[in-house]
Amino acid sequence: MKRSDIADLILERLQIEKSSLEHCFKTSKDSIGYFFIDDVLPEDIATKIFRAFPDPNSMEIKKSLREHKYITAQMNKYDSILEEVIFAFQDLRIVQLIGNICEINTLYPDNNLYAGGISLMRKEQFLNPHLDNSHDKDRRNWRVLNLLYYISPNWEIEFGGNLEIWPEGIKNKQITIHSKFNRLAVISTNDASWHSVSPITYDASRCCISNYYFSDSPPKKNSIFYVTSFRGRPEQKIRDTILQADNLLRMGVRKVFPKGLIKTNHIYRK
């Protein structure tokens, strides 16, 4: 299936729900703007996408105090439908419509898939509260939106692996967004957009397709560059101290080496 055909279907769903999505984002944007929409694609297509997910052993594993998950952006190694659906979300009609919903004038997709692509998480894997890196890989444009398309059939909220956003900071109560099959969640990314993935408690694969949108303008006034920054969960006092020190160290490195010491592997090398 071609990306243009997939994009047509996504666009139709967004147009149908546009008013409710605008309301959701507008009422939340003063903290962490977000919306989500279900039944993004016909069920048979969404199921086909899930079945195309690769064996996690063929993906890169990220395992540290920050996170534990499988990722890849090298989409030409896998079933073509995965690449097609990722880039369907980069169709300029969809980008423009989501920009209208979120009231962002200039918005660009990222064909490098910097920190995007696909991810897979299994039992006991997690993603701690964090802020996404403020810029694209070349530090030219501002990262402003995170798009997460969940694709695991019959995934119950009790299984964990759900998106959590922390509009009042990580010491206060989070909002949980169920990573429900065939659901798209969109959240704003700025220096207060703390979000996480709850630990998975069920013996199955939670699969996600990720995109980021960028802009010429920062998401907030007086925004500055920052690296991806992790924190501990409220009960993880020691981990939180370690991760805050790690954030400071990596920011210090970027002040000396603006693009970092090591080139990221998490991009699509075509």
Where do the language-model regions lie?
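Non-heme Fe(II)/2-oxoglutarate
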Residues: 3, 16-101
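A eukaryotic "domain-start" boundary segment
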Residues: 4-10
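A structural signal for short, well-ordered beta-strand segments and their strand-loop junctions
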Residues: 36, 60, 108-111, 117, ...
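A structural signal for well-ordered alpha-helical scaffolds and beta->alpha junctions
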Residues: 42, 46, 82, 91-95, ...
